[in-house]
Amino acid sequence: MNISDRLEQTLLRPDSMEEEVRLACMGAKSHNLAALALPPVWARFAAIALAGSPVRLDVLVGYPLGTHTPSVKGLEARLALEEGAAEITFVPNLAAYKTGYRETFSQDVAYTLKQCRLVNPDAVVKVLLYLDLLSQA
């Protein structure tokens, strides 16, 4: 079994430059990684750089804290998929969950997933939870 095809590389710094993203794409391809996770601003560039390789582009939505409204997350996800992302990892509204607004939390997740499915029914959609934030009172 080759573990590298199960690994995902990330480059999520807000000050990442084009050359760093290009090198991350090249590295993900040369190491046969499963995916490369990037902010939405790099979706189109990375999709072109990764074209023809098995490396999937994973774009983070609502990152880093999940405080975007569902409509903003939905738009981010749709645009990322339209620009070539194969996966979406999104951060839900944990503040809503922690303060007892479970319906708001559920709607946030459901809306983002629905928007992804409208563009690409086969896209992998993942939820990123900061568990340490859940345990803080």
Kindly label every feature range from the protein language model.
Residues 34-37, 87-89, 126:
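Conserved beta-strand positions in the central sheet of alpha/beta enzyme cores
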Residues 82-83, 93:
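A structural-propensity feature for long, helix-poor, extended segments
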Residues 20-24, 76-80, 105-115:
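A general structural detector for well-ordered alpha-helical segments in enzyme core domains, enriched
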Residues 1-74, 82:
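Conserved N-terminal beta1-alpha1 strand-loop-helix module at the mouth
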Residues 58, 88-91:
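Short hydrophobic alpha-helical runs that function as membrane-insertion/retention elements
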Residues 31, 83-84, 115, 119-120:
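Structural motif
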Residues 66-67, 94-99:
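A short acidic, helix-capping loop that chelates divalent metal ions and anchors anionic groups
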